[in-house]
């Protein structure tokens, strides 16, 4: 009897992706984040769908529709907080996934890496627009400040901003289009994620050593299905703990005040997962310079394959590079902390130094360390 799993046109795709996929036998838990991101995306799409059934994208009713969801809809508060904290979990998994890629040299798979960077941009855009929807103070002012950055573009800036706003300020038109885009983008992300996976399966997974593992592959199922299930259970545990015990831990209290264009909050800041980029933006006194640095802080990921000077793929056997990598992680966390602080004396200079170190590490120090390591190994 011919196995339907291997012959049926649809089952064959599923089989080659999740069942009979040849996988390196030594991939660690850092390889769990890909499947966790898939889980986060599905959770966000489902909770978002149920929220959209009760939400009204109108400046007069948006805020009260969220209150209605939390008070009057059956388990509406659970859905709302799962969605809000699900975004935080999404970004934790994203940053861990990117960090894993940087450490183990996964960026050598160019197509997979570049689609991953596009995915990162798309997820960031989606999260930003989602934050605007509750129409609280931070939603409104966050939207105003971030969209206003585009006015730094010479010649077309102001026109571009007004085109995005759909008027002369962030208003009803802006909220409606942000809702429409926030609804459609996750499906685009899903499509991109499938392409991301498609390109990955062209080459096969990397592994901690960075050495080709074609001679030592095992089937994905049952080994990695069970491993991914454990990861998924841990993710769900953390998400539920956060949602049920501290739903507002990562939010901003200002967003419980309805949006008021006449009153600016004392400290305008985005959600925690954008703070590192916000700190880089604020550390440059010039508007256009700040916007360029902000863009480059993410776009720099596209240049990482070009900056790979080592003869080894992974950092597993490269102590200097490891040291600089963890310095980069510490710098990322420092920038995240500084982005949430007010613009005053110690934080300003710390932010500028941390921003400088961020670019210096990626563009200069890490490639140089790799060259030194090559020399030491007489390669």
UniProtKB/Swiss-Prot annotation:
Location of this chain's protein in the cell: Mitochondrion inner membrane
Primary subcellular site in the record, as a coarse category: mitochondrion
Cofactor binding note from Swiss-Prot or TrEMBL: Binds 2 heme b groups non-covalently.
Record: residues binding heme b b566: 97, 196
Signal sequence region: none
Keywords of this entry: Electron transport, Heme, Iron, Membrane, Metal-binding, Mitochondrion, Mitochondrion inner membrane, Respiratory chain, Transmembrane, Transmembrane helix, Transport, Ubiquinone
The protein's role, per its UniProt record: Component of the ubiquinol-cytochrome c reductase complex (complex III or cytochrome b-c1 complex) that is part of the mitochondrial respiratory chain. The b-c1 complex mediates electron transfer from ubiquinol to cytochrome c. Contributes to the generation of a proton gradient across the mitochondrial membrane that is then used for ATP synthesis.
Subunit relationships: The cytochrome bc1 complex contains 11 subunits: 3 respiratory subunits (MT-CYB, CYC1 and UQCRFS1), 2 core proteins (UQCRC1 and UQCRC2) and 6 low-molecular weight proteins (UQCRH/QCR6, UQCRB/QCR7, UQCRQ/QCR8, UQCR10/QCR9, UQCR11/QCR10 and a cleavage product of UQCRFS1). This cytochrome bc1 complex then forms a dimer.
Note from the entry: Heme 1 (or BL or b562) is low-potential and absorbs at about 562 nm, and heme 2 (or BH or b566) is high-potential and absorbs at about 566 nm.
Protein's recorded name: Cytochrome b
Organism (species): Hyperoodon ampullatus (Northern bottlenose whale)
Gene that this polypeptide is encoded by: MT-CYB
């Amino acid at each position: 009897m011919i196995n339907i799993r291997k012959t049926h046109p649809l089952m064959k795709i599923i089989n080659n992706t999740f069942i009979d996929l040849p996988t390196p036998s030594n991939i660690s838990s850092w390889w769990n984040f890909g499947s966790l991101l898939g889980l986060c995306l599905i959770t966000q799409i489902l909770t978002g769908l149920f929220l959209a059934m009760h939400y009204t994208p109108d400046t007069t009713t948006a805020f009260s529709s969220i209150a209605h969801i939390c008070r009057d809809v059956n388990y509406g508060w659970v859905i709302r907080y799962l969605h809000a904290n699900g975004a935080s979990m999404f970004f934790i998994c994203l940053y861990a996934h990117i960090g894993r890629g940087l450490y183990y040299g996964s960026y050598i798979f160019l197509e997979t890496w570049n689609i991953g960077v596009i995915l990162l941009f798309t997820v960031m855009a989606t999260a930003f627009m989602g934050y605007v929807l509750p129409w609280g103070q931070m939603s409104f002012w966050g939207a105003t400040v971030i969209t206003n950055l585009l006015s730094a573009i010479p010649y077309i800036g102001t026109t571009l901003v007004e085109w995005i706003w759909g008027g002369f300020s962030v208003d009803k038109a802006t909220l409606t289009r942000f809702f429409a885009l926030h609804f459609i983008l996750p499906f685009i992300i899903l499509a991109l994620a499938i392409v991301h996976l498609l390109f990955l399966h062209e080459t096969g997974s990397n592994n901690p050593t960075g050495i080709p593992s074609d001679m030592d592959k095992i089937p994905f199922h049952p080994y990695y299905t069970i491993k991914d299930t454990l990861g998924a259970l841990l993710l769900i545990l953390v998400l539920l703990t956060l949602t049920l015990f501290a739903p507002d831990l990562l939010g901003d209290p200002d967003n419980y005040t309805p949006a008021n264009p006449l009153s600016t909050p004392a400290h305008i800041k985005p959600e925690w997962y954008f703070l590192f980029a916000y700190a880089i933006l604020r550390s440059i006194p010039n508007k256009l310079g700040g916007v360029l640095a902000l863009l480059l802080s993410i776009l720099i990921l596209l240049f990482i394959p070009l900056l790979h000077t080592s003869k080894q793929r992974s950092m597993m056997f490269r102590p200097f590079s490891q040291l600089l990598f963890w310095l980069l992680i510490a710098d990322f966390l420092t920038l995240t902390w500084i982005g949430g602080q007010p613009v005053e004396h110690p934080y300003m200079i710390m932010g500028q130094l941390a921003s400088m170190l961020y670019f210096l590490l990626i563009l200069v120090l890490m490639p140089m360390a790799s060259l030194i390591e090559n020399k030491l190994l007489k390669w």
